[in-house]
């Protein structure tokens, strides 16, 4: 029988499993990622987030449709049958009263509200005497119940025709008739039927007008070995657990249609990646970085904590951390002119930094240093996540495998070398992954907020049962990693090296 793997046809026996089909297609996937199978389409009826409010006026029946943006607004609308239009002005229409004694809410005064917004107001501060208000123009509203609102999406012209006394007869959900794609999660050992379409990954085409945000997405993928972990899922979007990133610019603000990928550029969720499942209007806090070209159905069935394979077009073009020979091969692969500055073997910086800008300019300038000037380190991100994030931020390694440290002081006779940190950020570092009995030579650590010199970064040059890499006692020390290669080079440094730049390159592997 014939099935399809990521769009490609594959012939397999009748009793074949998902695993058999993947092997026949030459496709391998990690055991911990989610896979789906698309079975076809079916006609369905489903409720939407909109409610139809029916009003009676004489022999005529009027209909208004409100898109509900909060569950409590649905509960308010359920109380409307029997209520009447109590007043109309050139600015607003009020229906009620309605009893909302069972709802939790807060009230504010003088809140600016757009036209044709449905809100709840509490003019007497008595929840049994609340009113459902529809605005006709932008206006400041008094005694508004915050976070209980909706939008009039149909029947706006009728709002202006209401004169008072019209009665709400009933409220009903708006039902959509749609064609629904039948998709289900599967395991590698599940059986298949003829025509099944196996989806193993999501393919994203990057937008050329969001190079910085796209690089953040590419870095997140690279650090997670091509997999993204689902953080949150709603009917509107699926969000991805991000790598930390700061100071994202506003770029390529556009419509958030189904399949659009965005990165939040501000706020507490800065850096979070979103894939939209339903259309939404543009918002300045979201940069559109790409569009799902294949595999959107997989994101319709994932759950929080799932991992999905993701590929991008184009893939990341990052030279930092490569040898000069590797950099030349990469430049040739993508038809990019390579300009090498400096004497050495290891690329420690590149300009432009962003993949999309490199491909746009078809030229990249890289800075190289001798390999023996680059210290290789392993970071313990799982054991000390906040401290490792701090280290990457200080060294500018949030999106690159190579960073820079400046020597603060080097005393071989004291058994440590200390590098400059960021005192302001360091004061926010809580104790985590403190040493227990001893600190071995090569251990990398930072001073936490328990000590005056919070934020200093250090490497232990010899074992100690008393002091950490920055010379602090164990309660003031957060262990963040170890030196894998180059400890001898650090031992050669002394006070004449104060202020010198030391390059560090992260290697990932088993401890």
UniProtKB/Swiss-Prot annotation:
Belongs to the UPF0288 family. It comes from the Archaea. It comes from Methanopyrus kandleri (strain AV19 / DSM 6324 / JCM 9639 / NBRC 100938). This is UPF0288 protein MK0796. InterPro entries: Cyclophilin-like_dom_sf, Methan_mark_3, PASTA_dom. Transmembrane segments: none annotated.
């Amino acid at each position: 029988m014939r099935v399809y793997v990521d769009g490609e046809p594959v012939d397999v026996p009748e009793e074949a499993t998902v695993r058999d089909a993947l092997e026949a297609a030459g496709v391998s996937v990690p055991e911990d990622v989610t896979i789906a199978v698309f079975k076809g389409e079916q006609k369905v009826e489903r409720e939407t987030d909109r409610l139809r409010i029916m009003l009676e006026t004489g022999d005529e029946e009027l209909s208004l449709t409100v898109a509900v943006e909060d569950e409590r607004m649905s509960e308010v609308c359920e109380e409307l049958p029997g209520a009447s239009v109590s007043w109309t002005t050139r600015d607003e229409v009020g229906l009620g009263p309605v009893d909302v004694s069972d709802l939790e809410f807060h009230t504010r005064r003088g809140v600016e509200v757009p036209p044709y917004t449905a809100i709840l107001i509490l003019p007497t501060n008595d929840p049994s005497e609340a009113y459902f208000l529809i605005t006709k123009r932008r206006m400041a509203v008094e005694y508004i119940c915050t976070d209980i609102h909706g939008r009039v999406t149909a029947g706006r012209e009728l709002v202006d025709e209401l004169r008072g006394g019209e009665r709400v007869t009933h409220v009903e959900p708006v039902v959509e008739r749609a064609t629904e794609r039948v998709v289900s999660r599967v395991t590698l050992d599940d059986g298949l039927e003829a025509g099944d379409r196996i989806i193993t990954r999501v393919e994203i085409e990057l937008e050329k007008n969001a190079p910085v945000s796209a690089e953040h997405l590419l870095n997140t993928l690279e650090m997670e070995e091509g997999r993204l972990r689902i953080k949150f899922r709603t009917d509107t979007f699926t969000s991805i657990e991000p790598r930390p990133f700061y100071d994202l610019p506003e770029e390529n603000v556009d419509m958030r249609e189904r399949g659009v990928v965005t990165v939040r550029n501000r706020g507490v969720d800065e850096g979070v990646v979103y894939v939209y499942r339903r259309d939404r209007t543009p918002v300045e806090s979201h940069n559109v970085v790409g569009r799902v070209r294949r595999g959107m159905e997989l994101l319709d069935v994932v759950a929080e904590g799932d991992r999905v394979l993701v590929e991008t077009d184009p893939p990341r073009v990052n030279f930092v951390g490569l040898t000069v020979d590797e950099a030349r091969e990469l430049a040739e692969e993508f038809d990019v002119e390579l300009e090498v500055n400096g004497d050495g073997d290891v690329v420690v910086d590149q300009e432009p930094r962003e993949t999309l800008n490199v491909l746009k300019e078809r030229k990249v300038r890289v800075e190289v240093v001798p390999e023996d000037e680059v210290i290789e380190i392993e970071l313990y991100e799982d054991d000390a996540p906040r401290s490792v994030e701090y280290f990457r931020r200080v060294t500018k390694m949030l999106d690159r495998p190579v960073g820079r440290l400046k020597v603060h002081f080097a005393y071989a006779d004291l058994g440590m070398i200390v590098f400059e940190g960021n005192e302001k950020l360091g004061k926010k570092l809580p104790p985590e992954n403190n040493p227990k009995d001893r600190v071995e030579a090569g251990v990398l650590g930072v001073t936490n907020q328990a000590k005056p010199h919070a934020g200093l970064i250090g490497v232990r040059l010899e074992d100690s049962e008393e002091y950490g890499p920055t010379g602090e006692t164990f309660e003031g020390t957060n262990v963040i990693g170890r030196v894998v290669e180059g400890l001898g080079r650090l031992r050669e440094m002394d006070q004449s090296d104060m202020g010198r730049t030391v390059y560090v390159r992260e290697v990932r592997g088993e401890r």
